[in-house]
Amino acid sequence: MKTTTDFLKMKAAGEKIVMVTAYDYPAAKFAEAANVDMILVGDSLGMVVLGYDSTMPVTVADMIHHAKATRRGAKDTFVVVDMPFGSYHGDVNETLKTAIYMMQETGADALKVEGAGDIIPVIQKLTTAGIPVVAHLGLLPQSAGVLGGYKVQGKTAEQATKLIEDAKQCEEAGACAVVLECIPHQLTEIVSAHLIIPTIGIGAGVEADGQVLVYHDMLSYGSHHVPKFVQQFANMGKEASEGMVRYVEAVKAGTFPAQKHFFTMKEDALDQLYGGVQS
């Protein structure tokens, strides 16, 4: 399994870091078999798995449930788990208790939090306690309402300057990596150059030190809206939909189950069942 030190070395060597989300055992198995470098159990599961309109309803219990399944499917991959909305915005000592609980319950290798500013003390508190933290800047899904929706961030010089400073503060606070979401690719290049820790982009251009995509988006699996920055590398949704239709048709037509799917009793057992007389 790779470690935070390995990711620093990969950045220094110019080797791209591959991260993908996973929320359950089979997805994690696929990801590990493909040799991804990191798996993110994101609170995006609220939208792509649980059917919510945003990530805000996702709870700590939700994250632990899905992270446990993911960890079982990817025992040898670096797993990052999101701290959900509201779990790290209050007293830092309470946040630390929650973070420790999540780490112990899930077997995660790191936790991820969104934002800078008031979140910097959280990053410091967790990393001082020995919990690796991945920061998240740019578009912050948990704060999308405050940001005016799911829009590109850092497009003005003022916004870009603030994001660069926020990234530096996250690194100084002890973050082991930073996710950059939906920012101009030129800004990604600048931020990446200013940091020792790796940047992981999502909708942030090729200049990031690594990339992350949502499993369901990249495989077209149940996603009704695909963002501009996503490339679909397979069409699982189409295959699943067509397979479901074929199943319904086969059952209705009486062609499933076929004889090869049957289990059979021996004749003497049948005789005993019917008392030697079969109708």
Swiss-Prot record:
Enzyme class at the top of the EC tree: transferase
Similarity comment text for this entry: Belongs to the PanB family.
Record has Ubl conjugation as a keyword: no
Residue numbers binding 3-methyl-2-oxobutanoate: D43, S44, D82, K112
A single GO BP: pantothenate biosynthetic process
Recorded superkingdom: Bacteria
Keywords: Cytoplasm, Magnesium, Metal-binding, Pantothenate biosynthesis, Transferase
Record's keyword annotation contains Zinc: no
Cofactor(s) it depends on: Mg(2+)
Alphabetical list of SUPFAM superfamilies matching this protein: Phosphoenolpyruvate/pyruvate domain (SSF51621)
Protein name, UniProt field: 3-methyl-2-oxobutanoate hydroxymethyltransferase
Underlying gene: panB
Reaction catalysis annotation: 3-methyl-2-oxobutanoate + (6R)-5,10-methylene-5,6,7,8-tetrahydrofolate + H2O = 2-dehydropantoate + (6S)-5,6,7,8-tetrahydrofolate
